[in-house]
């Protein structure tokens, strides 16, 4: 059993903790929290609570939440740390991990240079093998890699042009925006293009990003120039070999991200998460070697399976297909067509 500590229990950290706890070959040794809030109160029922340092202990004790120790105590009891702290904090934390000689996974908000490899389970599982420091790429990059990898593998890719309509913030965040505006990123390509190349080496790609006043999901409009001609059926069949890509058909009645998240609720998933990248089959258009499609991305959860697979790769205990199958089985990710 791999002993996994979770430093940071926000949107990603709490989901990774849950996913790790479901695996047969891993155990959660504890989580690090900074505030004795409602999240800490609920989490303390399932996980041991640790704090960044002793100065945080009294606030937790006053709230009636037992503290097991500091992050250094958690490191002592773990073999790897998943650092899901806010963007930029992981870089500060890395010094401690290096000093204590413990493996660590960082999330996509950190710069690629923080790690020895960036990671996506489908496109570059082997690059994280036996590494000490790995970065799981962002939700948007994960989504693009998921659907582009099968196309590159089967047809080859000459060029990708993706427009990313980003959600403004997560559902539980009442501080960020925009609330009543559309906010384009004026840097073209957006940061997603170079980030995608960290897990799909040499890919010729450009991206445009636009923030929209919604909290539910991102939406991508993707245009791909393949190296060889394909049909619409060829493209869809390539995706159907991968469980983490979900085909949404006309008969589903799903035409919005609101309905897409309602589908996740109907699955009965923990936190109503949709780990899969949902591609509207009606949107798939193929003319010769040019492919266009639209996909929806649940930014809170699509990177969660990747974190689990990254752990196995770093400890060299499974190949890609076996690890992905193990993870998918526990998270109830199945081949689905709607």
UniProtKB/Swiss-Prot annotation:
<feature type="binding site">
    <location>
        <position position="109"/>
    </location>
    <ligand>
        <name>NAD(+)</name>
    </ligand>
</feature>
<feature type="binding site">
    <location>
        <position position="169"/>
    </location>
    <ligand>
        <name>D-glyceraldehyde 3-phosphate</name>
    </ligand>
</feature>
<dbReference type="GO" id="GO:0006096">
    <property type="term" value="P:glycolytic process"/>
</dbReference>
<dbReference type="InterPro" id="IPR036291">
    <property type="entry name" value="NAD(P)-bd_dom_sf"/>
</dbReference>
<feature type="binding site">
    <location>
        <begin position="192"/>
        <end position="193"/>
    </location>
    <ligand>
        <name>D-glyceraldehyde 3-phosphate</name>
    </ligand>
</feature>
<keyword id="KW-0521">NADP</keyword>
<feature type="binding site">
    <location>
        <begin position="138"/>
        <end position="140"/>
    </location>
    <ligand>
        <name>D-glyceraldehyde 3-phosphate</name>
    </ligand>
</feature>
<dbReference type="GO" id="GO:0050661">
    <property type="term" value="F:NADP binding"/>
</dbReference>
<keyword id="KW-0963">Cytoplasm</keyword>
<dbReference type="GO" id="GO:0005737">
    <property type="term" value="C:cytoplasm"/>
</dbReference>
<feature type="binding site">
    <location>
        <position position="299"/>
    </location>
    <ligand>
        <name>NAD(+)</name>
    </ligand>
</feature>
<dbReference type="InterPro" id="IPR006436">
    <property type="entry name" value="Glyceraldehyde-3-P_DH_2_arc"/>
</dbReference>
<comment type="subunit">
    <text>Homotetramer.</text>
</comment>
<protein>
    <recommendedName>
        <fullName>Glyceraldehyde-3-phosphate dehydrogenase</fullName>
        <ecNumber>1.2.1.59</ecNumber>
    </recommendedName>
</protein>
<keyword id="KW-0324">Glycolysis</keyword>
<dbReference type="GO" id="GO:0047100">
    <property type="term" value="F:glyceraldehyde-3-phosphate dehydrogenase (NADP+) (phosphorylating) activity"/>
</dbReference>
<feature type="active site" description="Nucleophile">
    <location>
        <position position="139"/>
    </location>
</feature>
<comment type="pathway">
    <text>Carbohydrate degradation; glycolysis; pyruvate from D-glyceraldehyde 3-phosphate: step 1/5.</text>
</comment>
<dbReference type="InterPro" id="IPR020829">
    <property type="entry name" value="GlycerAld_3-P_DH_cat"/>
</dbReference>
<dbReference type="InterPro" id="IPR020830">
    <property type="entry name" value="GlycerAld_3-P_DH_AS"/>
</dbReference>
<dbReference type="InterPro" id="IPR020831">
    <property type="entry name" value="GlycerAld/Erythrose_P_DH"/>
</dbReference>
<dbReference type="GO" id="GO:0004365">
    <property type="term" value="F:glyceraldehyde-3-phosphate dehydrogenase (NAD+) (phosphorylating) activity"/>
</dbReference>
<keyword id="KW-0560">Oxidoreductase</keyword>
<dbReference type="InterPro" id="IPR020828">
    <property type="entry name" value="GlycerAld_3-P_DH_NAD(P)-bd"/>
</dbReference>
<comment type="similarity">
    <text>Belongs to the glyceraldehyde-3-phosphate dehydrogenase family.</text>
</comment>
<keyword id="KW-0520">NAD</keyword>
<dbReference type="Pfam" id="PF02800">
    <property type="entry name" value="Gp_dh_C"/>
</dbReference>
<dbReference type="GO" id="GO:0051287">
    <property type="term" value="F:NAD binding"/>
</dbReference>
<feature type="binding site">
    <location>
        <position position="167"/>
    </location>
    <ligand>
        <name>NAD(+)</name>
    </ligand>
</feature>
<feature type="binding site">
    <location>
        <begin position="11"/>
        <end position="12"/>
    </location>
    <ligand>
        <name>NAD(+)</name>
    </ligand>
</feature>
């Amino acid at each position: 059993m791999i002993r996994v500590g979770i430093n940071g229990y926000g949107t990603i950290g709490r989901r990774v903790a849950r996913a790790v706890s479901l695996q047969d070959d891993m155990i959660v040794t504890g989580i690090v929290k900074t505030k004795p809030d409602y999240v800490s109160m609920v989490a303390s029922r399932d996980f041991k609570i640790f704090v960044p340092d002793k100065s945080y202990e009294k606030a937790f004790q006053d709230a009636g939440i037992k503290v097991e120790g500091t992050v250094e105590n958690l490191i002592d009891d773990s073999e790897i740390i998943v650092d899901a702290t806010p963007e930029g904090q992981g870089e500060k934390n890395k010094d401690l991990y290096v000093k204590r000689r413990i493996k660590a996974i960082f999330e996509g908000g950190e710069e690629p240079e923080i790690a020895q490899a960036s990671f996506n389970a489908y496109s570059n599982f082997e690059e994280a093998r036996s590494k000490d420091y790995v970065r799981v790429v962002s939700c948007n990059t994960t989504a693009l890699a998921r659907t582009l990898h099968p196309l590159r593998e089967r047809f080859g890719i000459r060029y990708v042009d993706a427009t990313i309509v980003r959600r403004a913030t997560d559902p539980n965040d009442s501080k960020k925006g925009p609330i009543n505006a559309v906010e384009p990123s004026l840097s073209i390509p957006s940061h997603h293009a170079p980030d995608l190349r960290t897990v799909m080496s040499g890919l010729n790609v450009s991206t445009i990003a636009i923030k929209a006043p919604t909290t539910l999901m991102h939406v991508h409009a993707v245009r791909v120039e393949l190296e060889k001609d394909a049909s619409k059926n060829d493209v869809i069949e390539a995706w159907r070999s991968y469980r983490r890509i979900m085909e949404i058909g006309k008969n589903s009645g799903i035409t919005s991200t609101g309905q897409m998240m309602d589908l996740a609720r109907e699955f009965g998933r923990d936190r109503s998460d949709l780990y899969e990248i949902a591609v509207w089959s009606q949107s798939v258009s193929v003319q010769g070697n040019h492919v266009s499609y639209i996909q929806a991305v649940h930014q809170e959860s699509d990177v969660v399976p990747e974190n689990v697979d990254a752990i196995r790769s770093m400890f060299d205990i499974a190949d890609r297909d076996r690890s992905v199958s193990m993870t998918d089985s526990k998270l109830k990710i199945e081949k689905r067509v709607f």
